[in-house]
Amino acid sequence: MSFEISVEEIEELIETGNLNIDHALKELGATSQSSLNKPPSQSSRTEGNDGGTKISRNPAPVEAPAHTSTAQRSHNEENESGRQNLDSLSMISNKPQTGTLLMGSDTQLPSPSKTYQGLILDAKKRALNEPRRDQKITNEHGSMNDTRIFKRGGNIDTRKEAWVTQNQRSRTQPPLQDIEESTRFHGLTEEPQYPSGAIHAAHQSNQLPLSKNAHVEDVPKFANYASEILDAIKALEVRLDRIEGKVDKIMLTQNTIQQTKNDTQQIKGSLATIEGLITTMKIMDPGVPSKVSLRSLNKESEQVPIIVTGNGDVSKFVDQDNTITLDSLARPILSGTKQKTDERRAGVRIDALKITVSEMIRDLFGDCDKSKKLLESINMATTEQDINLIKTNALRSIT
């Protein structure tokens, strides 16, 4: 089973292996230092035929060297300080991680006899010898194979690469502390062929298609009237906003309605009180008695002599011919003339009487045909007698 690993994953695996080696070397260094101070029954390391390291007990006493060279001591101190700095800066656990590193068929396992620097150089050489992402190789059949790795959501045919090199990543972004996950590729955007509709997005297939052609039955249908549906939804939203505004206004008038109800109850109580007081009162209406008619009253009246005393013209009060007056010498004179009135004052009195009778008719009859006829007859009247006659007829029609 063949598989490929990206450059970033290889570098992260190398870094993890280096940290494990550092931890192992640190432990071995601590063991060797402690062996110098322990009794003679101390363990010693021996090389096996198979290239592995074996631990054996040596009963013979081993004496530590009295002194070491200055260069060797400085070299050990620098190694220990560098390891401590790496341990303090690294966010990965210092404990060795157990597991199997999956490599390609042509990858060699690191030899435990090599040093730390040698392991780093070997890893760099393997990374340089591996084919790049954009490199094409020829297989045994003579066809070209593209070594670029296809990720989820990506497109092999696109020219835009979804990754950057490690140097560019270190310049633009901080170093990652974990394995980077695959990023989502949103695809290429194209303008829809139907301006009045919309094409639904199809779900991405997990399998790599063999060709760019697709079956007609698998392609989702486009919406021909998407814009009209949106217009209808917007119209419904506008109507809903208007209805909400009207409901808010109605809710504001709720307090006014309650206040009106309270006022109505108070008015009903006051009206009931007034009705009770009216029943205790006796109202006398100075009108025509119901049992005696006006004609019977006129028959009962008789002519009697009337004496008007004082100076002045009696013609203003008496309009009959058979009147006796006294002249300037106090002599009785039979007056054969009719009532005389001042023409200037007569016109003013007639106009005032017309206005009074017209208002009375409007109050009694309102705006009806009978009221209009009476008003027309009042306007056509020229004397006070005519106006008084119209007034009398109007009052009789009511009773």
Curated annotation (Swiss-Prot):
Sorted UniProt keywords: Coiled coil, Phosphoprotein, Viral RNA replication
Gene name for this UniProt entry: P/V
Protein name in the entry: Phosphoprotein
Disulphide connectivity of cysteines: none
InterPro entries with a match to the protein in the record: P/V_Pprotein_paramyxoviral
One Pfam family recorded for the sequence: Paramyx_P_V_C
Region (Disordered) location: 30-112
Coiled coil ranges: 226-253
Source species: Human parainfluenza 4a virus (strain Toshiba)
Residue ranges with Polar residues bias: 30-46, 82-112
Function: Essential cofactor of the RNA polymerase L that plays a central role in the transcription and replication by forming the polymerase complex with RNA polymerase L and recruiting L to the genomic N-RNA template for RNA synthesis. Also plays a central role in the encapsidation of nascent RNA chains by forming the encapsidation complex with the nucleocapsid protein N (N-P complex). Acts as a chaperone for newly synthesized free N protein, so-called N0, allowing encapsidation of nascent RNA chains during replication.
Complex and partners: Homotetramer. Interacts (via multimerization domain) with polymerase L; this interaction forms the polymerase L-P complex. Interacts (via N-terminus) with N0 (via Ncore); this interaction allows P to chaperon N0 to avoid N polymerization before encapsidation. Interacts (via C-terminus) with N-RNA template; this interaction positions the polymerase on the template for both transcription and replication.
Cell wall biogenesis/degradation is among the record's keywords: no
Domain notes from UniProt: The N-terminus consists of a long intrinsically disordered tail. The central part contains the coiled-coil multimerization domain (PMD). Forms a four-stranded coiled coil structure. The C-terminus constitutes the alpha-helical domain that binds to the nucleocapsid (N-RNA complex).
Family to which this protein belongs: Belongs to the rubulavirus/avulavirus P protein family.
Annotated stretches, region: Multimerization: 224-287
